[in-house]
Design a protein with these regions (language model features):
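Serine-hydrolase catalytic core recognition
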Residues: 1-274
Length: 274
């Protein structure tokens, strides 16, 4: 059928104040009389956004490939993202666990009203790095909305990440008694709320986001008696290098199995045809 561009979308933020811009990918053979699960690809910033560059790109990650498996895929730049006004960028300063999630949910609900083929009862999310932080946070803070999440290499506790990130967007660490201002933003403090299916992934040699960020969440999930899935990639840094296609396939399989309710092909190999 050839290449097709994603649909440009505009929705309102959580308060109905600002226009939010994004992209939507649909299956090439979309049947508007059917219902499709929706997957939100997220990168919350605050130094960037989910959509990424506004320049033309023939492909944006594997979003179209994921859509072809039977999903609606969206990327929405929420409040707190750059390239807008100062007040827009500062929208959740010092509240890093916000992660634009109320904007994402508001936008997804508006899209479901606009496009009746979207099934909000089957909503998923995935992201890498800051998007991994946001995805786990979504599964813990909004467990009745997001049913499936894939959290890759997330900076789940910004006390264990670069100070030039945390202090820039959350402020200096301050302590009141036994609690500090970063504590309630850390995903391990919210892990007990998990209801859906969550996959955590991390490279064991990540020198950007140390793997102990994910171990903190794993420890909290175990203590809370929660079921989850874990993929640790030996010798991989913040990106997964030679294991990137493997992780992409695991991501596809996880959504197909748990959000679409289908059985993915066993050990499918992604790569050039021989």
């Amino acid at each position: 059928a050839g290449w097709k561009a994603p649909t440009r979308i505009t929705v309102k933020d959580r308060a109905g104040k600002w226009d939010l811009y994004g992209l939507m990918w649909t299956p090439t053979a979309l049947d508007s009389t059917k219902k499709y699960p929706i997957i939100n690809y997220i990168y919350p910033g605050p130094q960037g956004g989910s959509v990424g560059s506004r320049q033309f790109s023939a492909a944006t990650r594997d979003n179209q490939a994921l859509a072809e498996l039977g999903f609606i895929v969206v990327a929405i730049d929420g409040t707190g993202n750059p390239t807008r006004s100062k007040s827009f960028h500062d929208a959740y300063y010092a509240r890093m666990s916000d992660n634009t999630l109320p904007d994402q949910i508001a936008g997804m609900k508006q899209l479901a009203e606009r496009y009746r083929f979207i099934d909000l009862e089957r909503a998923g999310m995935w992201g890498h790095s800051g998007g991994g932080f946001a995805t786990a946070s979504a599964m813990f803070q909004y467990p009745d909305f997001f049913k499936v999440g894939i959290s890759e290499s997330g900076n789940h506790d910004n006390r264990n990440y670069e100070d030039d990130w945390g202090e820039r967007y959350h402020g200096l660490l301050t302590t009141t008694g036994a609690v500090d201002n970063y504590d309630k933003e850390a995903n391990q403090t919210l892990a007990k709320n998990l209801k859906g299916k969550l996959m955590l992934a991390h490279g064991t040699m990540d020198d950007n986001v140390p793997p102990d960020n994910t171990w903190l969440v794993v420890d909290a999930l175990i203590k809370a008696g929660k079921d989850f899935d874990l993929v640790m990639i030996p010798n991989a840094a913040h990106g997964y290098g030679a294991a990137s296609n493997y992780m992409m396939r695991r991501r596809w399989d996880y959504f197909v199995q748990h959000l679409l309710g289908a059985t993915p092909p066993k050990a499918y190999q992604i790569g050039p045809k021989s």
